[in-house]
Amino acid sequence: VVLTVAAVPFLSPAQQLGLRQRWSARLLKILGIHLSADAPFIGPGSLIVANHVSWLDIFVINAAFPTTFVSKAEVRGWPLAGWLAAKHETVFLRRGSRGHARIVNGEITALLAQGRHVTIFPEGTTTDGSHVLGFHGALLQAAIEARAPLQPIAIAYRLPDGSYTRAPAYDGDLSLLDSLRAIVAEPRILARLRVADPLSVTDTPDRKALSHLARDAIVAGIAD
């Protein structure tokens, strides 16, 4: 893993995304997680908005649609995870700072203008996957500025019989080790991505309205 990540700076953006996708798919296979996405691709330069259940979400989305993620700044200081995130072009956000949010919006806008996918988790935290919290819409401004599609994606984790499982949930005071134990205790988990119709920022150039529309689409995707 270390050697693979060390090679990332020497790869082209397309090669980096391909490597990220393959590495993520491999990790899911090791953990016994089967990925199901109901769309083969999404339009270039999309701002992906998704509900947030687990640390696995990043690998699930990357295995289907390689992307740059926006993460809270604290992650940068985490052992190994922070280093890996930084090497994979993660955009770090200092939560609670409006000034920094404007800077991050500028970074996201530039990436979208290059045709890159960027993913945010507008709930701002994780849940157990049974519901969706309210969305914070500040970072949706980047899609408006870049005139980029807003792509809602609902993440749901299910057992083979289709029933809900909270095994992948990384919420509360659960440690990463406890989370891993819960995941591997299940012989097979289905990570399901429901890709909603993209939202046009031209039709709805308002962050608050876009937030509500994106959340409604994700709630519907989880219930499906």
Describe the function of each predicted region.
Residues 2-17, 28-31, 43-98:
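Catalytic core of membrane glycerolipid acyltransferases/transacylases, capturing the structured
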Residues 45-47, 90, 117-121, 149, ...:
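Residue-level preference for the first positions of well-ordered beta-strands
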Residues 111-140:
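Catalytic-site beta-strand/loop segments enriched in glycine and acidic/polar residues
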